[in-house]
Amino acid sequence: MTASSGPGIALKGEAIGLAVIAELPLVIVNVQRGGPSTGLPTKTEQSDLFQALYGRNGEAPVPVIAAQTPGDCFYAAFEACEVAIKYRTPVFLLSDGYLANGSEPWSIPIFDDLPNIDPNFAVQNDDVAFMPYQRDKKTLARPWAIPGTSGLEHRIGGCLLYTSPSPRDS
């Protein structure tokens, strides 16, 4: 999870695009503020929707969720985490200065009553080869292989190379 406002999100555009192609579940909170460029940090505005939808190079779509009240911020963030993990994608959570600085009474949820978020980690099975490119038919997400787990490498016909080839070799 990371948070910023419009100018900071603009600087993170390439990394967000990389997270899309790498299928990394993460939540990006954008607390919107007014104006172009560095803008007006003390003026609130809801002007970053297009940035959230299209602010990356190429086709890198991401889900966008917006909180509607200060009390809704927790549930919107929880929903963003659910979507990010279930579908292996970055998710934008939009807020603004009014929500960031506002308050309202709300009941703190009982955490045992919240739905469980299952990351669907890949497990090594000696009987079946790990197929990282196979996807869940319902969500189209891949199992989440924990980096470094033996036998869960994403390798189809590749080979390990511990020395870089020299241009003279070609």
Task: Mark where each language-model region is.
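Ligand-binding clefts of soluble mixed alpha/beta catalytic domains
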Residues: G35-T38, E45-N57, P115, P119, ...
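Short capping/connector residues at structural and topological boundaries
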Residues: E14, Y54-N57, S103-E104, F111
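Flexible, low-complexity linker and terminal segments
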Residues: A76-S164, R168-S170
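Short acidic (Asp/Glu) and glycine-rich catalytic loops that position anionic groups and cofactors
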Residues: Y54-P61, C159-L160
